[in-house]
Swiss-Prot record:
Keyword Magnesium tagged: no
UniProt keyword annotation of Isomerase present: no
Residues of this chain annotated as glycosylated in UniProt: 36, 44, 89, 109, 151, 197
Descriptive protein name: Glycoprotein integral membrane protein 1
Spans traversing the lipid bilayer: 282-302
Chain intervals for the UniProt region annotation (Disordered): 206-245
Stretches in topological domain Cytoplasmic: 303-352
Extracellular topological domain residue ranges: 26-281
Biased composition (Basic and acidic residues): 225-244
């Protein structure tokens, strides 16, 4: 009995180790892309030399830019820091050590190619365009395009950067009204890390009274402790100001809705079906082509053999006599049999 329990514990321990190993193996592969681009101001045609650092991550064929997910074949607009290389400050004047915020339009095209060693490689094409530096609208005369080749077996990535006029870019043709806006990922993570309250905001100096609250004796949890009205606020004006700000404050972000979860599930299902059909449909047509060619080829070969080596006899065919409705061969055999019987009878009569 004890040995059986030890065996069960060992099997359970091995299963846990396998699960942990598989969970740790699924790590995001990242690659840093440094882009040096030139932007022109739409107001006074000031030229800015800008350097942008983008962290591209790959996890389960999903693409992430600076921690934000990107949809293939779609334009995503996001904000990220940029470095001014020429020392000029933008019109807003709020740059710190040459760092300013810039608004980018990004488009990623994803496809699969096969290397010379018969390995399947993931091929990514990233197009980039700056439309705003700080508070100033800018234009980018030359579009940067980064080609990334990712080897899924060795987890190695190679990148090649190309620059060409914006008129030849597909990114500039797509209207900006269809862009998908992505907020800063760091802000989203900071908001999600906050403790979500289950009660409303109370008019206290520390309005978030439900965070890490310890219930007082005789009080229920998540209930504001009783305080004297004189100690709540330092002045009447402060009370009114805090009440107005709390009423206008937006609620904290909650968890994802069921609709967004369903949309993500349908999107993943669509990608899996697309990959399945792209792999199975060519194989199906190849099999059908082999079947059609085989049937047609066998028919042609049989016809040629019939022409070269014709058969002398056609077995299985009877030629009927229209008068007797009997085959000619059968008629001849019957006549022969009748003549034989008549000769035998005549011989017997003579002998008698």
């Amino acid at each position: 009995m004890a040995s059986r329990c030890k065996i069960h514990l060992t099997v359970a321990y091995l299963l846990i180790l396998c699960i942990l190993a598989s969970a740790q193996s699924k790590q995001m592969t990242t690659e840093t892309v440094v882009l040096n681009v030139t932007a022109l101001s739409e107001i006074n045609q000031t030229k800015y030399n800008v350097q942008i650092n983008l962290n591209i991550g790959l996890l389960d064929n999903d693409i992430f830019i600076n921690g934000a997910p990107l949809k293939p074949s779609g334009v995503t607009r996001m904000t990220c820091p940029a470095l001014l290389l020429d020392g000029y400050n933008v019109s807003s004047g709020n740059s710190v050590d040459g760092l300013v915020s810039c608004e980018l339009r990004l488009m990623v095209n994803q496809s699969y190619v096969q290397s010379d060693a018969a390995e399947q490689l993931l091929f990514l094409v990233l197009s980039q365009e700056i439309i705003q530096l700080a508070d100033e609208k800018v234009q980018q005369p030359e579009i940067s395009e980064v080609e990334i080749m990712w080897n899924q077996s060795s987890e190695q990535m190679t990148q090649v950067t190309s620059i060409y006029p914006s008129a030849r870019s597909k990114l500039s043709i797509i209207p900006r009204e269809n862009d998908v806006l992505v907020t800063d990922a760091s802000v989203q993570s900071a908001v999600e890390d906050q403790v979500r309250n289950t009660t409303s905001h109370y008019l206290l100096k520390n309005s978030e009274t439900t965070q890490e609250e310890i219930a007082a004796p005789g009080k229920l949890p998540e209930t504001p402790l009783r305080m004297d009205p004189e100690t709540l606020y330092e002045s009447r004006e402060e009370e009114e100001r805090r009440s107005d700000s709390l009423l206008l404050e937006p609620p904290l972000s909650g968890s994802m809705s069921s609709y967004s979860v369903a949309c993500q599930w349908v999107e993943k299902l669509r990608d899996k079906l697309r990959r399945f059909l792209s792999d199975s449909v060519p194989l199906f047509f190849l099999v059908m082509w082999v079947v059609v060619v085989g049937v047609a080829g066998s028919a042609v070969v049989i016809k040629i053999l019939d022409l070269i080596f014709p058969s002398c006899e056609h077995r299985g065919f009877f030629h009927l006599n229209p008068e007797t409705l009997m085959p000619d061969d059968e008629k001849v055999s019957l006549i022969d049999n009748m003549e034989g019987d008549m000769t035998e009878k005549s011989i017997l009569l003579i002998e008698k």
